[in-house]
Swiss-Prot record:
<comment type="function">
    <text>DNA repair enzyme involved in the repair of deaminated bases. Selectively cleaves double-stranded DNA at the second phosphodiester bond 3' to a deoxyinosine leaving behind the intact lesion on the nicked DNA.</text>
</comment>
<dbReference type="Pfam" id="PF04493">
    <property type="entry name" value="Endonuclease_5"/>
</dbReference>
<comment type="similarity">
    <text>Belongs to the endonuclease V family.</text>
</comment>
<feature type="binding site">
    <location>
        <position position="46"/>
    </location>
    <ligand>
        <name>Mg(2+)</name>
    </ligand>
</feature>
<feature type="site" description="Interaction with target DNA">
    <location>
        <position position="84"/>
    </location>
</feature>
<dbReference type="GO" id="GO:0006281">
    <property type="term" value="P:DNA repair"/>
</dbReference>
<keyword id="KW-0460">Magnesium</keyword>
<protein>
    <recommendedName>
        <fullName>Endonuclease V</fullName>
        <ecNumber>3.1.21.7</ecNumber>
    </recommendedName>
</protein>
<keyword id="KW-0227">DNA damage</keyword>
<dbReference type="GO" id="GO:0000287">
    <property type="term" value="F:magnesium ion binding"/>
</dbReference>
<keyword id="KW-0963">Cytoplasm</keyword>
<feature type="binding site">
    <location>
        <position position="114"/>
    </location>
    <ligand>
        <name>Mg(2+)</name>
    </ligand>
</feature>
<dbReference type="InterPro" id="IPR007581">
    <property type="entry name" value="Endonuclease-V"/>
</dbReference>
<dbReference type="GO" id="GO:0005737">
    <property type="term" value="C:cytoplasm"/>
</dbReference>
<dbReference type="GO" id="GO:0043737">
    <property type="term" value="F:deoxyribonuclease V activity"/>
</dbReference>
<keyword id="KW-0540">Nuclease</keyword>
<dbReference type="GO" id="GO:0016891">
    <property type="term" value="F:RNA endonuclease activity, producing 5'-phosphomonoesters"/>
</dbReference>
Length: 229
């Protein structure tokens, strides 16, 4: 497991963090199709915290996009690098997530984040931030709609409805399993929204949550127990 320290110059205040978001947000690419769903590699990233010790563990799990078999995995443990502030959660996680990605023995391909991309109050959530820093195609698949509104999509798998900030579509509520509550998909970087939804459906053949996130969540929880034992 890779050990990470807070990088020199990392934002220490909300004002500094928002300035970084403002600087990087203009680099997000929204209109590329990204890799075809079900091809190449796709990587899930997730984190787990021990708040008493200020420890965060990140996991990156690479799957074969066609079979959803695990190809590679890596973890990293670090100090929590920013206070808990809604809208700025990426600053708590990104140094450790980047270290986990760097520790992989193969290129990650498309990255799927358990969270948000442009479906974010400042249109720059974790998936967008990670995509801009790495240059890799990224999407966000979240379990709840955050502060945004939506109409419930139809009951069948694959039904979708716009996730709205006022009149602007910032993502989609997507039904990944018939009769089960939707997930909330948004563009991160270099993958448009239609393809982000197609990737999400390809990653959810049996369960509501993408297989990438399920595997990364399980691994980071195990790694946190090991790191804090």
């Amino acid at each position: 497991m890779t050990t990470v320290r807070i990088p020199a110059g990392w934002p220490a205040t909300e004002e500094e963090a928002r300035a970084v978001q403002d600087e990087l947000r203009g680099r997000v690419i929204l209109d590329e199709p990204g890799p075809p769903p079900g091809t190449g590699r796709v990587t899930g990233v997730d984190v787990a915290y021990d708040d008493e010790r200020d420890v965060v563990v990140a996991a990156a799990v690479v799957l074969d996009a066609a079979t959803l078999d695990v190809v590679a995995e890596a973890t990293a443990v670090g100090e929590v690098s920013f206070p808990y502030v809604p809208g700025l959660l990426a600053f708590r996680e990104i140094p450790t997530v980047l270290a986990a990605l760097d520790a992989l023995p193969c290129p990650p391909g498309l990255i799927v984040c358990d969270g948000y991309g442009v479906a974010h109050p400042r249109r720059f959530g974790l998936a967008s931030h990670l995509g801009v820093l790495t240059g890799l195609p990224t999407i966000g698949v979240a379990k709840n709609p955050f502060t945004f509104s939506y109409e419930d999509p139809g009951a069948p798998r694959g039904s979708a409805a716009p996730l709205l900030a006022g009149a602007d579509e910032v993502g989609r509520a997507l039904r990944t399993q018939s009769g089960v509550k939707p997930v909330f998909v948004s563009v991160g970087h270099r993958v448009d929204l239609d393809h982000a939804c197609a990737h999400t459906l390809a990653l959810t053949p049996k369960y509501r949550i993408p297989e990438t996130t399920r595997r990364a969540d399980s691994l980071c929880r195990r790694a946190l127990k090991e790191a804090t034992a």
